[in-house]
Design a protein with these regions (language model features):
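Conserved coil-to-alpha-helix start sites within the AMP-binding
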Residues: 89-95
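Short, glycine/acidic-enriched loop or turn micro-motifs at the edges of active sites
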Residues: 11, 91, 112, 140, ...
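Short, well-ordered alpha-helices that flank and scaffold nucleotide-derived cofactor binding pockets
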Residues: 70-74, 96, 100, 150, ...
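N-terminal "arm"/small-domain region of PLP-dependent enzymes with the aminotransferase-like
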Residues: 1-32
């Protein structure tokens, strides 16, 4: 029986091996492993992709989010005890970044048709302590609507994007600055380049993207021990830098983003065409949005575990995203 892996990182990286090796040879020849030309290039290309003014490469997606909230605290935009609205269905990293900075996560429910944050539910959670709403573009689907802009303007809250799963996606609705690309819709966005992502590193890597110059400067300093210049530490910072090896991998893969996305769309179209079982709820697709299919998520409301067992017996791996949501994790009960 043929076995179908949920994901093969070896197969995912095979098309780019020669380019990656050539880039790594440049790094070995240069002897420059941090703050080099590949990280600088990656930052420029990410900012351009999102139609944003600034990008800061960093160590991973969680640190990208942590740096965003830490920067807002250092800038006086937020203070300990302030609230951040987060979707109830997301990876725990989205919430860890909030609590790590002394902020309070407030969980809002999702829209079952999109699996993303329900902005009507989010509005009901807003209080005088609310300083931000986190939108997570889950599974590669843009989490955006005119309501996001309305809430930001009406309540004066920041919109923080968790764009870990949706690089290259875009919304049919314009963002706060008139752009449509995820990562440039809100005030600031965090990216993850964990190996399983659409654009994945050979280890951990992340980035922060924003058009707010002051915020970008604070994030950059905080990621480098809090230093704005060498041996001049304006913050009690962290060590959250991206090394040149990971930056080089990401530069290579980012150059292939369009073909990677097209391939994912083609596979999603096959699923759409051939999944006809009425007990399986397929993803809702908005034709005006650009969905990048980080995952092809389905719901089997009545017989999920039985369905997974059936798939496993036929050699097909599946997973649950997420088996235990953050608000039910022991650390957040």
């Amino acid at each position: 029986m043929k076995h179908y892996q949920f994901l093969s990182l070896k197969k995912a990286n095979e098309p780019y091996v020669d380019e990656i090796r050539a880039a790594w040879e440049q790094i070995l020849d240069d002897g420059w492993y941090l703050h080099g030309k590949f990280a600088a290039r990656l930052e420029r290309e990410l900012a351009d992709l999102c139609h944003a003014g600034h990008a800061v490469a960093c160590s991973n997606g969680l640190d990208a989010l942590r740096l965003i909230f830490r920067a807002y605290v250092e800038m006086g935009v937020m203070q300990r005890g302030d609230e951040v609205i987060v979707p109830a269905n997301t990876y725990v990293a989205s919430v860890l970044a909030v609590t790590d900075n002394g902020l309070v996560p407030v969980f809002a429910d999702i829209d079952e048709t999109t699996m993303n944050l329900d902005f009507a539910q989010a509005e009901q959670k807003i209080t005088s302590r609310t300083k931000a709403i986190m939108v997570v573009h889950l599974y590669g689907s843009p989490c955006w609507s005119p309501d996001a802009v309305r809430l930001a303007e009406r309540y004066g809250v920041k919109i923080v994007e968790d764009n870990a799963q949706a690089i290259g996606a875009s919304s049919r609705f314009a963002g706060l600055h008139g752009t449509h690309a995820t990562g440039g819709l809100g005030d600031v966005a965090a990216f993850s380049f964990y190996p399983t992502k659409n654009i994945g590193a050979m280890g951990d890597a992340g980035a922060v993207v924003t058009s707010d110059k002051q915020l970008a400067s604070a994030v950059r300093a905080l990621a480098n021990y809090g230093a704005d210049t060498r041996y001049h530490n304006i913050y009690r910072g962290l060590n959250c830098r991206m090394d040149e090896l990971q930056a080089a991998v990401l530069c290579v893969k980012l150059g292939h983003l369009e073909e990677i996305t097209v391939a994912r769309r083609e596979r999603a179209a096959i699923y759409d065409a051939h999944i006809r079982n009425p007990q399986i709820v397929k993803p809702r697709i908005f034709s005006e949005d650009v969905q990048v299919w980080h995952q092809y998520e389905i719901r089997v409301p009545k017989r999920r575990d039985e369905f997974r067992d059936y798939m496993a017996r036929h050699g097909v791996e599946t997973d649950i995203h997420y088996a235990v949501p953050p608000h039910l994790q022991p650390c957040y009960r």
